[in-house]
């Protein structure tokens, strides 16, 4: 049975976040660039074959890799409720603006980071249940992100060196997760080998090849 997750905004005033003058931050919608970062739009990447069933690689804890059906993925207005078919989402309707390729300390609304996936990013996610944070998990995710080489389409002198987002997500079913366009990874712990393999294999899966930075404050 397919699970459906109805996502309401994690943040109370998303419009203010998008258009507010916090530190003068403005984020481009598709077709724009920020800080001179290189971007190339509409270079469609061939979709890889979907899995017949979820994979459970050997790991230090339970790991599941899956390929949910790709959803129609139009832009929707800020605040529009969106239903995704997987947790974490890996495609679907999303906001016109995406999150910057960086680490965030507070949750990024899913409707932003799905747009990052469309741009070929991998989003690294975690859920802390004790309220004290997950320093070991967060450092492990940083190490995974650091293991990726520089992306040749990114201008690291004025923007990100690659297309990776790290963010907490309290809606996750597991302590650790990752998403690429059309691919999901969930794990009960931080298993660095399997997560690094997932990120390496599915980086750049999006239908648009974009490395312009996005919104930096949430």
Q: Which residues fall in each region the model found?
A:
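Helix-rich interaction surfaces within compact, conserved domain-sized segments
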Residues: 147-218
């Amino acid at each position: 049975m397919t699970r459906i997750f109805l996502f309401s905004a994690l943040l109370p005033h998303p419009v203010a976040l998008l258009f507010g003058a916090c530190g003068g931050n403005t984020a481009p919608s598709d077709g724009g660039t920020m800080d001179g970062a290189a971007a190339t739009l509409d270079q469609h990447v061939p979709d890889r074959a979907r899995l017949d069933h979820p994979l459970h690689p050997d790991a230090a804890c339970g790991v599941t890799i899956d390929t949910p059906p790709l959803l129609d993925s139009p832009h929707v207005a800020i605040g529009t409720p969106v239903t995704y078919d997987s947790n974490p989402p890996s495609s679907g309707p999303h906001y016109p603006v995406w999150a910057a390729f960086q680490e965030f300390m507070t949750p990024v609304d899913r409707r932003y980071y799905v747009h990052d996936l469309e741009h070929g990013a991998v989003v690294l996610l975690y859920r802390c249940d004790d309220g004290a944070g997950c320093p070991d998990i967060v450092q492990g995710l940083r190490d995974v992100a650091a293991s990726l080489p520089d992306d040749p389409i990114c201008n690291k002198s004025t923007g990100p060196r690659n297309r990776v987002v790290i963010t907490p997500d309290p809606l996750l079913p597991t302590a650790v997760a990752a998403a690429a366009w059309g691919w999901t990874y969930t794990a009960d712990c931080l298993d660095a080998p399997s997560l690094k393999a997932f990120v390496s294999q599915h980086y750049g899966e999006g239908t648009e090849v974009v490395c312009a930075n996005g919104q930096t404050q949430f």
